[in-house]
Design a protein with these regions (language model features):
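Loop-to-helix junctions at membrane interfaces in multi-pass transport proteins
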Residues: 1-11, 45, 122-270
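Membrane-helix interface/capping residues of multi-pass secondary transporters
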Residues: 2, 90-91, 109-110, 118, ...
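Helix-loop-helix module between adjacent transmembrane segments
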Residues: 7-105, 182-186, 195, 274-281
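Helix-loop junctions at the membrane-solvent interface of multi-pass transporters
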Residues: 22, 86, 107, 133-137, ...
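Residues within membrane-spanning alpha-helices of integral membrane proteins
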Residues: 60, 67, 95-98, 118-121, ...
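N-terminal amphipathic, basic-rich helices that act as targeting or association modules
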Residues: 105-106, 210
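Residue-level micro-sites within transmembrane alpha helices that shape
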Residues: 116-119, 191, 281
Length: 281
């Protein structure tokens, strides 16, 4: 059902808004007061007048420790994507991807990272639109997609879920709701997000930025949830095989593969989708 993805999307949207509302302006103003700090560790040291730079060292250690698995997961995703696309060894694809990412980040610094974020957001938006439109078309139209989803008990509700093994609906546990909503708390401690708050040129632009960011998150996550429902409709139409468990997360890749079999232009569009997946890692 949509409960897992739906509650996660709600949590991420709320977390995005509250992070911009509560943290953004404060950290931007205090960054200016604290010697125009350009990193979180230096901000903590300057903010609390830590002349011995103990806070800076501790902050840097924590970021390194917790960002190793975070960045490693991104490198692993790149390796899996290129390995499946081009048939190269996974380790080779991962190393090449890591070298490219680390290279442009090192050479271009924060400006390069911010610029690529902007470009990647555009690519991801285009990819979502293509997947959404193509999926609905192949599944037989919006009515067919919704009709099939409604035929599964509990599939389209947020308080129940569909059990494919028994074909019945089951109550969605409260602990699961809380766990999914808690995803939004992660935004408050992400250094790469807080750095963008610190770097904004004028705090007066934060209100507009908050509206744009929240709107983008709500729309993109809503479309992402709907793509899962569309994938179910495509399965019912016989265009895709049923995906179970963790494999259900590959639905966008499956749709891109299907799209690429319809000619040269669709193949290029499929490449755009895969680029969007890569951009999101």
């Amino acid at each position: 059902g949509i409960a897992d993805a739906g509650w996660t999307a709600i949590g991420l949207a709320i977390g995005t808004y509250l992070n911009w509302k509560i943290v953004a302006k404060r950290i931007r103003l205090y960054t200016h007061v604290a010697g125009n700090s350009i990193t979180l560790p230096s901000f903590f040291s300057n903010r609390f007048r830590d002349d011995r730079r103990i806070l800076q060292s501790i902050g840097a250690i924590f970021i390194v420790i917790f960002f190793i698995p975070y960045t490693a997961s991104g490198f692993a995703a790149c390796g899996k994507l290129f390995s499946s696309l081009f048939g190269v060894k996974y380790l080779t694809a991962m190393i090449i991807s890591a070298l490219i990412i680390v290279g442009y980040t090192t050479l271009g610094g924060f400006l390069a990272a911010s610029t690529t974020d902007f470009i990647q957001s555009i690519i991801m938006s285009i990819a979502l639109i293509i997947v959404f439109g193509f999926g609905v078309s192949v599944a037989g139209g919006p009515d067919a997609v919704i009709s099939h989803a409604k035929s599964l008990p509990g599939y389209l509700t947020m308080m129940t879920t569909y059990n494919p093994e028994t074909g019945t609906e089951a109550a969605y546990p409260l602990i699961n709701i809380v766990s999914m909503l808690a995803w939004g708390l992660g935004y408050f401690g992400m250094p790469h997000i807080l750095l963008r708050f610190m770097a904004i040129e004028d705090e007066k632009k934060l209100s507009l930025s908050r509206r744009v960011a929240t709107t983008w998150v709500v729309i993109s996550l809503a479309v992402a949830v709907m793509i899962g429902v569309i994938g179910l409709g495509m399965t019912e139409a016989g265009e895709l095989e049923m995906l179970h468990g963790a494999n259900s997360e590959t639905i966008i890749v499956k749709i891109a593969d299907l799209l690429s079999t319809h000619g040269v232009l669709p193949a290029l569009l499929g490449g755009t989708i895969l680029a969007g997946i890569l951009a999101s890692t």
